[in-house]
Amino acid sequence: MPRIYLSPSTQEYNPYVTGNGSEEYFMNLVADAMEPYLLANGIQFSRNTPDMTAASSIRQANRGDYDFYLALHSNASGSGSQGQNRGVIAFYYPTSANGRRGAEIIARNMQEIYPLPERVVTRSTTLGEVRQPRAPAVLVEIGYHDNEADARWIESHIDAIGQNLAMSMAEYFGLPFTYPGPSQPGVIVTESGGPVNLRAEPSVTGRVLTRIPSGETVTVFGQYRGWYVVLYGDTLGYVSAPYVQI
């Protein structure tokens, strides 16, 4: 299954114009909101912590084996134009084809929920968080926190933003999007007593990640057309629903 590295902003010194929190605070809320949607769609993830920096986040990601690096930020206008700009920008590294593809998917989906869709754009950049990760990377600036309307939109749409970004990650990896249910334990049960396949896609032709013995307990995160998204040990994948007893 795909694995992504989430890097919500560590910039606690960037206050929202509303006075309700910082860039670090709200981008971590967005990352929190993404988690159940990612799990329900078979996407594993790791993330930084607020005491880290962009540089240490990149180093940590590069020590792992990730398929995508997603940095979550909100923007601010330059001196003399504070509060005057609005919009969402998905940045990618100029020579990264998959970074550009990810940015285009994110921007297209974000246009569906941002109140000014014509101001949702993609741009290339050489910023460290798209240049230095080994995995394809996107840095998304979700609105301007020095603009009253943007700041209030972010604050009141945390779950919608998290869902939208998770939907983009599912699309990037070619996975069907599934809405999460409450996570719950399940038991693998087969009539023969043999193991079942944990697959990378919800299909009998999906790549087999591992085999789960009958009687083993798994955690169920979601369901898609007769398949459950389950976590077995450290491996997230799909199991045919008839073999999972909840």
Question: Which residues fall in each region the model found?
Answer:
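Long, well-ordered alpha-helical scaffolding segments within enzyme catalytic domains
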Residues: 25, 29-39, 97-113, 151-180
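SH3/SH3-like beta-barrel fold
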Residues: 215, 228-232
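Short alpha-helix capping/helix-loop boundary micro-motifs
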Residues: 50, 202-207
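Active-site-adjacent mobile loop/cap segments within catalytic or ligand-binding domains
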Residues: 4-16, 59, 64, 69-78, ...
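Boundary regions of SH3-family modules and the immediately adjacent low-complexity/disordered segments
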Residues: 181, 232-246
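SH3-family beta-barrel domains
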Residues: 178-197, 210-214, 222-224, 245-246
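Solvent-exposed loop/turn segments at secondary-structure junctions
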Residues: 11-13, 51-54, 74-80, 95-98, ...
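Catalytic-core regions of hydrolytic enzymes
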Residues: 2-97
